[in-house]
From Swiss-Prot:
One of its GO terms (cellular component) is Golgi cisterna membrane. The gene is GAE2. Homodimer. It is found in: Golgi apparatus, Golgi stack membrane. The chain crosses the membrane at residues 32-52, 91-111. In roots, leaves, siliques, flowers, pollen and stems. This is UDP-glucuronate 4-epimerase 2. Belongs to the NAD(P)-dependent epimerase/dehydratase family. GO terms for molecular function: UDP-glucuronate 4-epimerase activity. Keywords: Carbohydrate metabolism, Golgi apparatus, Isomerase, Membrane, NAD, Transmembrane, Transmembrane helix. The active site is at residue 243. Its EC number is 5.1.3.6. Gene3D superfamilies: NAD(P)-binding Rossmann-like Domain (3.40.50.720).
């Protein structure tokens, strides 16, 4: 029986047995209590619906990411310590947030291969296919990387991780990605990219010793900037999307924690990362899927039929940049939340320096897949996309020898080979691209 079943739908009638003022007062009081209880239940019911029931057409991933996770206990702590244990003399111990993500998986694997201690953290939200994230998790587990299932907004979990392991570095790659999705679910971007980042920095600044932090910003911070190539000193005060605005906010927040608490912080502005184990919401990925299925693909063009181009950067080059930034990151200067001196604060572009028209990307995919694409040319919508990106990487080259080496033709060939091997059609693996 529902707890509301004992509340009558109508007041009904009853016969007064006692006309005394005391009795009248008592019955009025009881009636008031009943009404109060009823409306309280209605009020809390509405609160429940509002906060815990999101519309089907607009799922709130920020709420989903706060679901209850199971962590803690001796066995769990043993796995955490084992994964984070340094295997080489000069190795470091790194907490990688967003470890089940595209870049996070590749970076975690690379760190582990060279003998560093690596512990992953990911909330496995369903912004895109979670089975792909689970496959990445299985891949990392085979190499000895344990991914803690939890959220960066869980302060207790973060504090526990730093109690169990004195991390020397944090590679912060957890974020709500995607430019267009921000128009559907803006709260998830504030929740993950701003609140989550602040939460992580709060724990890091109180740690003893404080870790050095390398984190993923984005090339989207350049927004409506028209000066090319994009350089780190160019203006970034014209974001074209909420996603870009949250990443720009992250850079300002990083400056604040560096200035007040002495945290060593390095931001990396990624330029259109692609490759095996990529994100299904990226154009090269869903173009491949739709071309194979015979579906039409929408290709955007700029004003007056202008070219839309991207500085596509292969994942292996991005990983080299991440490790280079990590290896040259200086120690934080604070301790227990108190600054002891000036700390390092940097930001770098990680791109390929060779913008390629999206139409050329489609042509390459057609050759690799041996399928002609059904092209649908469309005007670039005002949803946060920009007509071009182009990275100036001279700062990263100078600081840690960053030098991308994979052209788009080579990188897409590797991606297509992985895609055809990973996804099956009719229960059989599709033949690999030539």
């Amino acid at each position: 029986m529902s707890h509301l079943d004992d509340i009558p739908s109508t007041p009904g009638k009853f016969k007064m047995m006692d006309k005394s003022p005391f009795f009248l007062h008592r019955t009025r009081w009881q009636s008031s209590v009943a009404k109060l209880a009823f409306w309280s239940l209605v009020f809390f019911g509405l609160l429940f619906i509002f906060f815990y029931r999101s519309p089907i057409s607009n799922p709130d991933s920020s709420r989903r990411s706060l679901r209850t996770y199971s962590w803690g206990g001796p066995a769990w702590e043993k796995r955490v310590r084992s994964s984070a244990r340094v295997r080489t003399r000069n190795g470091v111990s790194v907490l990688v947030t967003g470890a089940a993500g595209f870049v996070g998986t590749h970076v975690s694997a690379a760190l582990k291969r060279r003998g560093d201690g690596v512990l992953g953290l990911d909330n496995f939200n369903d912004y895109y296919d979670t089975s792909l994230k689970r496959s990445r998790q299985a891949l990392l587990e085979r190499s000895g990387v344990f991914i803690v299932e939890g959220d960066i907004n869980d302060l207790s979990l973060l504090k526990k991780l730093f109690e169990v392991v004195p991390f020397t570095h944090v590679m912060h790659l957890a974020a709500q990605a995607g430019v267009r999705y921000a128009m559907e679910n803006p709260g998830s971007y504030v929740h993950s990219n701003i609140a989550g980042f602040v939460n992580l920095l709060e724990v890091c600044k109180s740690a003893n010793p404080q870790p050095a932090i390398v984190w993923a910003s984005s090339s989207s911070v350049y927004g409506l900037n028209t000066k090319v190539p994009f350089s780190e000193k160019d203006r970034t005060d014209q974001p074209a999307s909420l996603y870009a605005a949250t990443k720009k906010a992250g850079e300002e927040i990083a400056h604040t924690y560096n200035h007040i608490y002495g945290l060593s912080l390095t931001g990396l502005r990624f330029f259109t990362v692609y490759g095996p184990w990529g994100r299904p919401d990226m154009a090269y990925f869903f173009f491949t899927r739709d071309i194979l299925k015979g579906k039409a693909i929408s290709i955007f063009e700029g004003a007056n039929h202008g070219t839309v181009a991207r500085d596509f950067t292969y994942i292996d080059d991005i990983v080299k940049g991440c490790l280079g930034a990590l290896d040259t990151a200086e120690k934080s200067t604070g301790s227990g939340g108190k600054k002891r001196g000036a700390a390092q604060l940097r930001v770098f572009n990680l791109g390929n320096t060779s913008p390629v028209p999206v139409t050329d990307l489609v042509s390459i995919l057609e050759r690799l897949l041996k399928v002609k694409a059904k092209r649908n040319m469309m005007k670039l919508p005002r949803n946060g996309d920009v007509p071009f990106t182009h990275a100036n990487i001279s700062s990263a080259q100078r600081e840690f020898g960053y030098k991308p080496s994979t052209d788009l033709q080579t990188g897409l060939k590797k991606f297509v080979r992985w895609y055809l091997g990973y996804y099956k059609q009719g229960g059989k693996k599709v033949a690999a691209a030539a």
